[in-house]
Amino acid sequence: MKKHILIGCFLTLFLNCKEVNKQYHLEDSYVKALNENRKIRAKNRVKYLELTGLFKLDSTTNSFGKAASNQFVLSIKNLVPRIGSIDLSKNELRFNAVKDIKVTNTFGEEIQTIALHIDANGNSAQLFHKQIKWQVITRSGELYLRVWDSKNPAIQAFKGFKSYEINNEFIFDAEFSYFETKRIETVESKLGIPDVTDFIGQLQFRYKGKAFSLDVGSGGFVMVGDLTSGETTYGGGRYMYIELPKTNGSVTLDFNYLYNPPCAYSEFTTCLYPPRQNQLDFRLKAGERLEETL
C-alpha cells in the first residue's frame, strides 16, 4: 500500500511525522488500487446476497420448504412445499429428504438421507436442491440452518454503498505490536448473543494530538466503531484489513479501506461487532457509508 503514497512530512515543534496526515499526497496509482479493492469487495458480496434464510435448530425435527406447515418457511419462488428436515438426536444430526425430491451433495451425488458431521470450523457439508443450497453452522455453541438461493432477487436489487471522498486525513503511520500469546475475547454479535474471536496484536496511532489503539485479529482483520456509527455509517461498525508485518514495526493504517460488514445488507448474517477497545471517539469520515447507491 505504501508504494502508492508519497509522504511529505514537515516536523514542527508540536507535531511529529505520524500525525501530519494531510501531508500524504495521493497518486493516481493509489486511487486506482483503492477502487480496484472496492470492485473486488462488491463481487465478493454476492455470496451474502444469496442468503435467504437463517434458522436456529431448536426442535427435534426441523422441516423446511415453502409451505407454511414447515418449521422453517422459505419464501422462494417455485420452491417445493417441503424439501426435507434436519433431525436432531442425542447422538446424531441428520438430513432426511422428502420422497421424490432430488437433493445432491457437493459431489453431485443424489442422497435421500445423510448424517451431518460438524467440522472444526463448526460447519456441516453443503447440500443442494435446484438453485438453493444449505448447511448447518455453529454460532456461540448453537446450531443454525443457513440457506442460499443463487437466484435471490436481492442480488440484482442491491446496487452497492456510497463512500466518503478519499481522505488523506485518515491515513496514518501506525505501530503494530504482536501480543505474546493470542487473546481470545468475547464480543457482541448480530445474533444478539456473545461470540468469541481472537486478537493477535495491536495498532497504535495518533490523531490530533491524541493516542489511539485498535486490537487486530488473525490475518490483519480489524473491526472499527467511531462517532459516525449509526449515523452516516453502519451502526454495528465497519471492517478492514491491514498488511501485517513479520515482526513488530510500522504499518500503514488507511481508513479509506473501511467497508460495511455483511449485516449492513443481509438480515441472514451473523456479524461480530467491534470490541469496546476498538471504539474510536472521533468521526471517521473515510471508507464506506451506509447510504446505498441509487
Predicted regions located by residue number:
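Flexible, glycine-rich surface segments
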Residues: D173-S229, Y234
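Sec-dependent signal peptide recognition
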Residues: K2-G8
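N-terminal beta-hairpin/loop module of FHA
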Residues: A33-K77, V224-T228
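Surface-exposed beta-loop interaction hotspot
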Residues: F128-D195
